[in-house]
């Protein structure tokens, strides 16, 4: 069975992420969406909130071979502990590729048994980024349904109302 890991912070999960997961599921028998923590990032949502929201969104799509998990450690460790042979990384533009390629070289030296698979973003999601969504959600008048599922938009709006009150 070909199992792939699709790691990310998912703060929040976007249609761009969902598109990449769907496309990865066409290549692999099983895809694990891994909600991970990056100590260099500051998050709007807690790790539990990011996991629960990502889980709800993926579950609502009814995909049987896609699973959600969370991990607070090095992604390569998770992959090795769970016998996962592939890590899928989305790339939107050249600067993403440059960053991901550097990661690929390091990961390959540390664990050559795990292959990194780069998937380019679909055209309509090239400029969809979680940080952009967080910036736009501050203005409650924007309809962000082309960036994020309604479930995510409702959660973020309620989160911002709580933070701003």
Curated annotation (Swiss-Prot):
Cofactor requirements of the protein: Mg(2+)
Cellular-component GO terms for this entry: cytoplasm
Domain of life assignment: Bacteria
Enzyme class per UniProt: transferase
Binding site for substrate: 9, 41, 75, 89
Catalysed reactions, semicolon-separated: (R)-4'-phosphopantetheine + ATP + H(+) = 3'-dephospho-CoA + diphosphate
GO terms of biological process kind: coenzyme A biosynthetic process
This protein's pathway: Cofactor biosynthesis; coenzyme A biosynthesis; CoA from (R)-pantothenate: step 4/5
Keywords: ATP-binding, Coenzyme A biosynthesis, Cytoplasm, Magnesium, Nucleotide-binding, Nucleotidyltransferase, Transferase
Primary residence: cytoplasm
Chain sites annotated for binding ATP: 9-10, 17, 90-92, 100, 125-131
Localization (cell): Cytoplasm
Signal peptide: none
Residues at the site labelled Transition state stabilizer: 17
EC code(s) of this entry: 2.7.7.3
GO molecular function: ATP binding; pantetheine-phosphate adenylyltransferase activity
Assembly with partners or alone: Homohexamer.
Function: Reversibly transfers an adenylyl group from ATP to 4'-phosphopantetheine, yielding dephospho-CoA (dPCoA) and pyrophosphate.
Similarity annotation: Belongs to the bacterial CoaD family.
Name of the protein in question: Phosphopantetheine adenylyltransferase
Organism of this sequence: Borrelia turicatae (strain 91E135)
């Amino acid at each position: 069975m070909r199992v792939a890991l699709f790691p990310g912070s998912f703060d929040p999960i976007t249609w761009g992420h969902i598109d990449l997961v769907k496309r990865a599921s066409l290549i692999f028998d099983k895809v694990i969406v891994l909600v991970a923590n990056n100590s260099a990032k500051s998050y709007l949502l807690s790790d539990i909130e990011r996991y629960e929201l990502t889980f709800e969104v993926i579950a609502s799509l009814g995909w049987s071979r896609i699973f959600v998990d969370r991990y607070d450690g090095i992604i390569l460790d998770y992959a090795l502990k769970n016998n996962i042979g592939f890590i899928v990384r989305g790339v939107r533009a050249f600067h993403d590729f440059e960053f991901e390629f550097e990661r690929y070289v390091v990961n390959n030296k540390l664990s050559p048994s795990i292959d990194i698979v780069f998937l380019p973003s679909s055209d309509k999601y090239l400029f969809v980024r979680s940080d952009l969504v967080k910036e736009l959600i501050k203005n409650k008048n924007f309809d962000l349904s082309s960036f994020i599922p309604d479930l995510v938009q409702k959660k973020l709006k309620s989160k911002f109302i709580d933070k701003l009150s």
